[in-house]
């Protein structure tokens, strides 16, 4: 069992069935080249889950919907762009591993045995934000999926799930692995 604490959550991930890109030697060699990664990955029920967790609780007094959701004719918010980069780069790393490219072989070497072969993916972003901003979750989810639609289609992923911490902790798919920090 591997236990991680991040962004107000404790993750208890199954031995031999999880990884963090950040811990892979191949990723460490590439990370200085503007490559990003999702926080956690684990296998459950024949699917590979990629999870990014973000807590905006500390910046709740200054955060607005415009800090999260792109508006037509304006610069894309950096928080939104960071999520796009993390998902896209994580998909690229997995697809490279499964395609056995030179870099992909190095990435594959660090993956659990079950993740070394192509498998169905679930992309999940869990966000903690104050209730005053929760009204923006659906807009953020829709904007994120619109921007990612072509990219995720290349990996046979239908959509990105964007949920708040309460839904993450209440969902049986995740509650076996994820708890709120005490």
Model-derived segments and spans:
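Flexible, charged surface loops at secondary-structure boundaries
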Residues: 33, 42-45, 116-118
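Conserved catalytic cores of phosphodiester-cleaving nucleases, focusing on short active-site segments
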Residues: 40-42, 49-55
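Basic, amphipathic N-terminal segments that precede the first structured/catalytic domain
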Residues: 1-38, 172-182
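Catalytic cores of nucleic-acid endonucleases
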Residues: 56-126, 146-158
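Polybasic (Lys/Arg-rich)
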Residues: 1, 132-182
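Flexible, glycine-rich phosphate/dinucleotide-binding loops
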Residues: 49, 59, 132
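Structural motif
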Residues: 47-49, 122
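Short beta-alpha junction loops
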Residues: 127-131
């Amino acid at each position: 069992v591997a236990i991680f604490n991040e962004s107000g959550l404790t993750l208890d991930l199954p031995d031999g069935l999880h990884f963090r890109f950040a811990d892979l030697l191949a990723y460490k060699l590439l990370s200085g080249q503007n490559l990003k990664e999702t926080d956690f990955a684990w296998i459950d029920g024949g699917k590979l889950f990629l999870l990014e967790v973000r807590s905006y609780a500390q910046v709740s007094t200054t955060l607005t919907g415009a800090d999260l959701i792109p508006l037509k004719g304006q610069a894309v918010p950096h928080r939104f762009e960071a999520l796009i980069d993390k998902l896209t780069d994580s998909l690229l790393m997995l697809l490279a591993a499964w395609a056995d490219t030179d870099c992909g072989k190095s990435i594959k070497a660090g993956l659990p045995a079950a993740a070394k072969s192509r498998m169905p993916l679930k992309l999940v972003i869990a966000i903690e934000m104050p209730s005053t901003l929760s009204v923006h979750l659906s807009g953020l989810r829709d904007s994120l999926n619109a921007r990612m639609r072509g990219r995720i289609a290349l990996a046979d992923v239908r959509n990105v799930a964007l949920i708040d911490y309460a839904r993450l902790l209440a969902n049986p798919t995740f509650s076996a692995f994820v708890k709120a920090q005490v």
